[in-house]
Amino acid sequence: MTWICLSCMLWPEDLEAPKTHRFKVKTFKKVKPCGICRQVITQEGCTCKVCSFSCHRKCQAKVAAPCVPPSNHELVPITTENAPKNVVDKGEGASRGGNTRKSLEDNGSTRVTPSVQPHLQPIRNMSVSRTMEDSCELDLVYVTERIIAVSFPSTANEENFRSNLREVAQMLKSKHGGNYLLFNLSERRPDITKLHAKVLEFGWPDLHTPALEKICSICKAMDTWLNADPHNVVVLHNKGNRGRIGVVIAAYMHYSNISASADQALDRFAMKRFYEDKIVPIGQPSQRRYVHYFSGLLSGSIKMNNKPLFLHHVIMHGIPNFESKGGCRPFLRIYQAMQPVYTSGIYNIPGDSQTSVCITIEPGLLLKGDILLKCYHKKFRSPARDVIFRVQFHTCAIHDLGVVFGKEDLDDAFKDDRFPEYGKVEFVFSYGPEKIQGMEHLENGPSVSVDYNTSDPLIRWDSYDNFSGHRDDGMEEVVGHTQGPLDGSLYAKVKKKDSLHGSTGAVNATRPTLSATPNHVEHTLSVSSDSGNSTASTKTDKTDEPVPGASSATAALSPQEKRELDRLLSGFGLEREKQGAMYHTQHLRSRPAGGSAVPSSGRHVVPAQVHVNGGALASERETDILDDELPNQDGHSAGSMGTLSSLDGVTNTSEGGYPEALSPLTNGLDKSYPMEPMVNGGGYPYESASRAGPAHAGHTAPMRPSYSAQEGLAGYQREGPHPAWPQPVTTSHYAHDPSGMFRSQSFSEAEPQLPPAPVRGGSSREAVQRGLNSWQQQQQQQQQPRPPPRQQERAHLESLVASRPSPQPLAETPIPSLPEFPRAASQQEIEQSIETLNMLMLDLEPASAAAPLHKSQSVPGAWPGASPLSSQPLSGSSRQSHPLTQSRSGYIPSGHSLGTPEPAPRASLESVPPGRSYSPYDYQPCLAGPNQDFHSKSPASSSLPAFLPTTHSPPGPQQPPASLPGLTAQPLLSPKEATSDPSRTPEEEPLNLEGLVAHRVAGVQAREKQPAEPPAPLRRRAASDGQYENQSPEATSPRSPGVRSPVQCVSPELALTIALNPGGRPKEPHLHSYKEAFEEMEGTSPSSPPPSGVRSPPGLAKTPLSALGLKPHNPADILLHPTGEPRSYVESVARTAVAGPRAQDSEPKSFSAPATQAYGHEIPLRNGTLGGSFVSPSPLSTSSPILSADSTSVGSFPSGESSDQGPRTPTQPLLESGFRSGSLGQPSPSAQRNYQSSSPLPTVGSSYSSPDYSLQHFSSSPESQARAQFSVAGVHTVPGSPQARHRTVGTNTPPSPGFGWRAINPSMAAPSSPSLSHHQMMGPPGTGFHGSTVSSPQSSAATTPGSPSLCRHPAGVYQVSGLHNKVATTPGSPSLGRHPGAHQGNLASGLHSNAIASPGSPSLGRHLGGSGSVVPGSPCLDRHVAYGGYSTPEDRRPTLSRQSSASGYQAPSTPSFPVSPAYYPGLSSPATSPSPDSAAFRQGSPTPALPEKRRMSVGDRAGSLPNYATINGKVSSPVASGMSSPSGGSTVSFSHTLPDFSKYSMPDNSPETRAKVKFVQDTSKYWYKPEISREQAIALLKDQEPGAFIIRDSHSFRGAYGLAMKVSSPPPTIMQQNKKGDMTHELVRHFLIETGPRGVKLKGCPNEPNFGSLSALVYQHSIIPLALPCKLVIPNRDPTDESKDSSGPANSTADLLKQGAACNVLFVNSVDMESLTGPQAISKATSETLAADPTPAATIVHFKVSAQGITLTDNQRKLFFRRHYPLNTVTFCDLDPQERKWMKTEGGAPAKLFGFVARKQGSTTDNACHLFAELDPNQPASAIVNFVSKVMLNAGQKR
């Protein structure tokens, strides 16, 4: 053991007399100078045997210098620090001399043990410090009198280490007694916890830096302990590189400097000296960077950046030479909170052809929090990879959009000679996921090739998985085999002693070759579609990982070994690859007592897969993927429909199943094995070998049930093992405590776990996966103790402070626990940790450190079985967790989404047995392929059939509620961020660009604004449909000559393919990004991504990327050439969007050449008629889940050809099916088809009306009252032009009841009119139906007051000559004007476009320039821009779930608060809330447009067919399925387009199939209800027969659909949970239907095929249920009619109270009240808020009150996503007693303040007061308060 004096920094030996030299005479063959006289020694001389000092023999007597031995590090390979030492990234350091440091004896040096001490000089240089690092077994240093650092090299001998640990423990006990607290910074070792009474686990991977929050937690804990007693000391224990100790010492030095005192100055100096002398030379750049972050945040020199950053490019300047001929093959792995979120393709860079390489991430990858970016080099021929560089940073400290790291800033690379000295790495960020303009120069040269085969196991191999579950088995016996597939192999390895070195080798060391790996790509969702994890490859994972050096042959196993492996693998569902699924489950359930269970940290690589084929009971195979309107729902993205799951830090399950962490060697494991555990896909979950506890001789080691990353993301904590197992193990959570105080600690396993708060997921896949894992958790935790949460650890610490004995685990035996290492942080936690970090920096006062970390703590030990530790806060918000509502069978209660567990009343928490995981859902895992079984580890179910996962919830002590930190995570919002006017471009942070980005900005900004033009169209996210609002009313401005049209196109061939094989997959070879196709217009500013494409949080994407001057980088290279033949139908359609604006100013052209304007090429005639059958491509209305490629507004008119071309369909379906698009006022351009002038106007039937709309929702300008309301759009003949059919809005007909809610203003266009939404081209100029041309066409735009002109031309009068298109929008038209100037720009020049915008049209402002101003009360500020101060009806309408958009319908799920005396302007009746049985519900809206109702006339097909590249029957056109391009994320362009094959000619399809599918389509008006909410669907179905169903647009997962269906019996879990209330609601189950490149399918069902359309899906499931609980029963009548027949009058007070009401308000602040409530609490909170400096920034939130409680939704995601306060926690609600007002930052009248007081989550005494200010004058604070009081009163009466 080495001791060092800190006062002089000298070793004890250095204080002794100088040592004399031991000279010997030597003949020098090489010239060497004499050390004394400096003359050359020519022949003989003397040299010292010890220090090699040389001199002449005559000079020997003059030698005075002491003999100093050389530093040992000189003999150690310089590469030893390069790679993580704990056997991570095996093969990464192979070319550097090996990954693990070799023992010093191997290099010929002498190992220095405590008994052999070298004489070292003072530590002043790197060599000496390296000597310290490498030479001694154990280094114990008193950094200060009260801080002791104990460090041990990772390569040291284990026996010596154990003995040294014992010596240290004895020394500490003898010297400090019980007054020392040990902080373990490395892997947990059982012997450490045995030897020391007080241990806190804060481990993180070696050579890495800890999370910023963890640094805060450590400092706070140290300070608390040291301040508790002057005799207390802190011991920092570390095994590995001493950089970990350095980070803590430096951080604490800065931390203690906050409250600097003179008596601590010496301590701080000692810490500084220790850090600089001993740590800096051996530390990593990232560690120094984090110390700098911490110091800067504490001092205020670094301001918190709360904005999320989207990473678009990683540019490596200078090509490292990792290949023999130069060059390298890099690929990136990006981790957020140590969770993999992205894997790039492999770039092959020749050594001499490039000076830099750009790795482009499309769409931009959302990064927030602690980020680790690791760049690997994939070796060319060997299955190995090296680390090129590694860099860690935290986004809170990144303020520039261009960040450059030099070589000296890059871990690993900073001392790697292969990385050029001038090399640097540049990161290009933006504030949105869209491609950045102006970055064309970053495109790599032709010599750079990219391999997107990221399913290569070597690429998927994650380096950090094992760290979270690994322990360094200090004193335990070496397990006789690896505990599971440690390195990604399919089989575990039975370890045997190596005869040479005594190390443990492995039998069956090799894994199956790659070719032998079963390809489960069919069952894995594309990584790119969900989280941008990989690039184009949909093959996400494979099973095997080649071991470097392993032979290719698979060694045979003895029968005993096979049995052992089978037993081991039974927990994984692997069973050596050939056994069936039944065997897996039975294996698991009949597992012997000591057998292995599914490891909890193993992963389900089948992403979001829940279902199995065959034998399960129908009622137990339900997906139940709840998709919307849940209070705690996914924050930013949803589903794999092109979402950026990375927004939530979600890890694709195929990406990494658990927090990546460095995995140290299991004791005795052969050091040559790669220990980067493979996270392999292919449907096999893997468990890291070193994860299990000790095993006894007779059985395999205990392994915890399988676990996936999503579970960690969902905030679940990992479970301990079964109590019957030999040794319970604990794990840790990387970021569970949002406050960041104790985000990575470990606890005794058995202490009761409190229910984690619901966490926002990243995607629907994550949602499913969370449920998948929760199934196991429920099983595990019914039988396993849980690790206590952080807060308990905090209390543990305080109990130590109080000198209480450390609480023993509640398990029956002592628990040497596994290290609790970083669990993946959920995105919510990451966000909250950043926000909390900000607050922490303001709140970290060491003087008060002894106080509890959190203001709100529950009384420890208050519940049965509770440990003395207080509860851990689960969330920074005051949300309540939801009760366990899902069983293993995969059921999820209606109303709850996997992605977004709905908070439940606190009382429900108490029913959770403490041994169970508190997961929002218990879910059935699907393992390994399509025939997956559910692995239930419930002992009681062992005798059950394999497919009957039953739940047995053992009774147990009630779970204590979780304590909530008093910190309300509130990002510091500037007033401008809180402004309620989204039409204003938010001010962006200064663009501090560096590197390649900087020089692009000025030019682009200058280019974007030209003198006589409106401001550049700054794109803003329109949350309603994923668009970006263009704030320029001019589409024809020079900078945007063409406007992209997000029209989705489906080739007829493709449609036929899909129709012929409804359950199959379209053979679509190239699914390129259509969004890019439309963005790549020359000179076009990307005006709007296609609807429901990019799912970026609305509040995040407001930075105009055009301001960066960055041009999209389109991998598909789909440039739409403005001239020449279009290369594809997509391109031609895209040109159509451009043709309008360009033609606007051009002279009218005859219809004889329509294609020149519409498609850019001649459209061949079919059936002889050109004009009549021509339709310009028009998207569907956004209300429809599909975009129409043929402009028929999804069949706004009958799809049949006109009378002169073929039989016509009846006109009635026009309303029932044709009007599904909601094209009420006008059909699509194709409506100009040859409909005879005598064609009767379709009558408005009660086919379907949105329940979400009622008259109250829509108001318009006062003058609209006086005008006649239009009822339907008609096609008629205009006098004077008998041959031209005209479509006008009937302005003189009285409003039909069905349209009353929309028909407010005759000058409003049809609601959600698809044709208006993207293309206003009603046809080329002069589009006579028989070829007649219209001369002198004019374009006139009549605008109502408050509505900006839709056209460039002055507003004119209606003209009745030539061809007229009276384009009008109604308030419900969210899609009008989806492009800048779309209203006028896309109208062909030859049309009279009487474009009229109603003042209240929510979407007119969407892209019509900056003239729009958002009206207060707009539920989604990003979504609507109202004009002229008129608030849109949607603004008054209470709620829009976040997907109010994908459909374009802003489906309001709840009515506004009743304001009795006040009626809405312009309406004659009081506001009434719609309900399923109300008239508005039945008739209020036209029949929705079925997504696949895309009907093309022959002219359409004639025009489109030639544009498809049809090769061998494979259509290279887009698969119009609404899925994103392979790269996922924001490149999703046409989220809703599904092919309609009912009208396509199908040469080889069966007429029966076609007829039946058409039948399903024809009934779609009964079962496709896009606008209804979940509650309305339940109300419609709960009284129906089993099999009844409704498909609606998902309001949570944009672009997806929700399938609600009635089942015969509720899931078992629901029954067991004794849920109060009407169980009939539980009979309606909810599933998510996702859209993808290959069509639609049930989300998370491996045995579900892709269908080309919803109709095909419905038809197939009506024949065979597949993964559904039962077959679908296709309805023959509208359920809304039945609902009307069976129910009384709607909108009664009781209904309103039950359904709830909502509106938008300003969220002002949340203030802790301790136990105060009542008016005093509101008064106090108001006073504190108004007195605060700075005053809190108000944020617009959606305030919903229902019988369940109060739900707040921050639609802009500025502050939070959703917070739910169960009604039983709300104790008071009222106005401010002093009637103070809130002054709005944007001006306007002061608003009344009101608030409610609610108990904090997990607390029975502490309250928080949440303050709000009224926003909408039509929803006064008094009305809200009254309604809340009524709801509370009503709930009290029921109780």
Swiss-Prot record:
Glycosylation site positions: T1156, S1271
Keywords: Actin-binding, Cell junction, Cytoplasm, Cytoskeleton, Glycoprotein, Hydrolase, Metal-binding, Phosphoprotein, Protein phosphatase, SH2 domain, Zinc, Zinc-finger
Domain PTB: 1702-1837
Superkingdom of this protein's organism: Eukaryota
Annotated segments matching region Disordered: 85-116, 502-563, 689-708, 716-796, 852-1159, 1174-1270, 1277-1296, 1309-1348, 1366-1510
Compositionally biased intervals (Polar residues): 97-116, 502-518, 525-538, 1027-1039, 1189-1214, 1223-1268, 1330-1347, 1440-1457
Modified residues annotated as Phosphothreonine in this record: T504, T985, T1293, T1370
Tissue expression profile of the protein: In the lung, detected in the alveolar septa (at protein level). Ubiquitous.
Gene3D superfamilies (alphabetical): 2.60.40.1110, 3.30.60.20, Pleckstrin-homology domain (PH domain)/Phosphotyrosine-binding domain (PTB), Protein tyrosine phosphatase superfamily, SH2 domain
Regions of compositional bias (Low complexity) in chain numbering: 867-881, 937-951, 1176-1188, 1468-1480
Similarity comment: family membership: Belongs to the PTEN phosphatase protein family.
Name of the featured protein: Tensin-1
Protein source organism: Homo sapiens
